[in-house]
Amino acid sequence: MTRVDFSALDTAGLNLQAVFRLAALPGEVAAALDPEGRHRRLILIGHGGRTLWERVKAAGLATEHPIDEFTRARVAEWLAAQLPGVAHELVYPGDTPVGLQALGRLAGWHHESPFRVGVNADWGSWFAYRAVLLVDADLPESVPQAGASPCTTCPSQPCVTACPASALSDRDFSLQKCVAYRRQQDSRCRVTCVSRTSCPVRPEHRYDDAQIAHSYSRSLAMIEKFY
């Protein structure tokens, strides 16, 4: 059994890690990510809270995708230090389709929220998936994060009533209403999500306004391109 130290990733703000045995994942997941069966483990890497953005800003990356570039660099450094010479493949960020939320559910990180962003009791909705790494090493598997969805003990669900698009008013998310409202020039959700910022779970981990604007500007660009 090969043991590794994730502390360098923690310091970089990539403070969520889950190790899966590829052979134990649902067959369609393993087949899509590692069709030739060349690796033994999948490492899901994420971030929770504000530290990653602070590290990215300090790195001064003036690129279109600074978080992805920072993540690739830190993961490469970690691999060189912890698993030198081990065969590996970084499938995300990249062009390979990856079911990030499905992996998040298996890790115990992801519970569905009314506003369709994953939520958990430790970080609220203020976490994200940053890398999916395949390695040919016999790493110890992670124990899934325990705990039920915090939404089950939130009877008032202020995220529903806060949505200015009424996209959650029927207790089911309306992508059409959300997209139509975000496209409006005077929309309160062009570079944020009012429902998400109204969620009362772990507000101390909320991203700063610049990080929120960065993320939602990217999603708005996709909306304006494809809708």
Predicted regions mapped to residue ranges:
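Non-ligating segments of multi-cofactor redox enzymes
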Residues: 1-227
